[in-house]
Regions:
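Alpha-helical transmembrane segments and their short interhelical loops
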Residues: 88-140, 195
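Long, hydrophobic alpha-helical segments
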Residues: 42-65
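Alpha-helical membrane-inserting segments
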Residues: 35, 60, 97, 101-105, ...
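Transmembrane helix segments
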Residues: 35-38, 140-173
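Aromatic- and glycine-rich beta-strand/loop motifs that create alpha-glucan
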Residues: 1-34, 222-231
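Short hydrophobic, aromatic-rich alpha-helical segments embedded in or entering the lipid bilayer
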Residues: 3, 162-192
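Transmembrane helix boundary and interhelical loop/hinge segments in multi-pass membrane proteins
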Residues: 15, 57-80, 87
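Alpha-helical transmembrane segments of multi-pass membrane transporters/translocases
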Residues: 23-26, 36-37, 55-56, 120, ...
Length: 232
C-alpha cells in the first residue's frame, strides 16, 4: 500500500470509530437548513455553509489528534505531504456523499431549477473545507481554538458584503457566488467567478497546509561524527 493510501485508510478508520463525528456531519448542516427551510435561498446557503464548517471542523480535529504520531510517521519515511494529502482525501471522501445527499434533499424539498448548480455549490464547499481545516489544524495546537477560529471565518463570510474585498479574500466566497447563480438564476459570470475563486482557494489552501506541515514536522539533521585516525 502506498503512503497516501495508508494514511487515507487510517483516517477513515479513525472517523468511523467516532459515532459522534458521523452524527455531527449529518446533523449540523441539516439544522442549518431546517432553521431557514421556509426561505429557499437562505436555507440552501445556510446548508452549504453548515456543511463547510462541519467538514472543516472534522478535518481540524483529525489533524490535531494526529499530532502525536505525525513525527513518528515522518521518522518512518512518510513525507509531510503524504499526511496532508491522505487526510484531505479521507475527509473529502466523507463529505462528498453528504453533499450528494443534501443536494438530493434540496431537489425534492425546494423548487430550484438549477439543481446541478446547487450540487456543484455543495461539492465545491466540501472540497474547500477539507484543506481549510487542515491549515487551521497545522497552525493551532488545540481543537477548541481551531473550531472557534473556523467559526469566526464562517460568521464573517456570512455577514460580510459579497461585493467588498474582505468577503472576496475569505475561503467560502465561491460558495456565495455559485449559490447566487444557482438560487437567484443570475448570469453565467457569477458561476465563472465562483469556480475561479474555488480553484485558486483550493490550490492555495493545499499548498499552505503542506508548507506549514513540512516546516512543523521537519526532521533535525544530525551531523555525521568525524572519525579521526590516532597516531601510532
Amino acid at each position: 500500500m502506498t503512503p497516501i493510501g495508508a494514511v487515507v485508510r487510517a483516517c477513515l478508520l479513525e472517523v468511523s470509530r467516532r459515532r459522534g463525528v458521523i452524527v455531527l456531519l449529518v446533523l449540523l448542516p441539516m439544522v442549518f437548513y431546517l432553521v431557514r427551510r421556509d426561505l429557499e435561498g437562505q436555507s440552501i446557503r445556510m446548508l452549504a455553509l453548515g456543511l463547510g464548517w462541519t467538514v472543516s471542523t472534522v478535518a481540524l480535529f483529525v489533524a490535531v489528534s494526529a499530532r502525536g504520531i505525525d513525527r513518528r510517521l515522518r521518522l518512518s519515511g512518510y513525507a509531510a505531504w503524504h499526511l496532508v494529502v491522505g487526510r484531505g482525501l479521507a475527509i473529502t471522501a466523507c463529505g462528498l456523499p453528504l453533499a450528494g445527499m443534501f443536494g438530493l434533499l434540496i431537489a425534492v424539498d425546494q423548487d430550484v431549477d438549477r439543481v446541478w448548480a446547487v450540487i456543484l455549490l455543495l461539492v465545491t464547499t466540501t472540497l474547500i473545507a477539507a484543506p481549510l481545516g487542515a491549515v487551521f489544524g497545522a497552525l493551532l495546537p488545540r481543537d477548541l481554538e481551531g473550531a472557534l477560529a473556523l467559526l469566526v471565518v464562517l460568521a464573517t463570510q456570512m455577514l460580510a458584503d459579497p461585493s467588498e474585498r474582505l468577503a472576496k479574500i475569505l475561503p467560502f466566497w465561491s460558495t456565495r457566488e455559485i449559490g447566487t447563480y444557482a438560487i437567484d438564476e443570475t448570469g453565467y459570470d457569477y458561476l465563472a467567478r465562483g469556480v475561479a475563486h474555488f480553484a485558486a482557494t483550493w490550490l492555495l489552501l493545499i499548498a499552505a497546509a503542506i508548507a506549514i506541515s513540512t516546516i512543523r514536522l521537519r526532521l533535525a539533521r544530525i551531523p555525521a561524527p568525524q572519525v579521526t585516525q590516532g597516531g601510532a
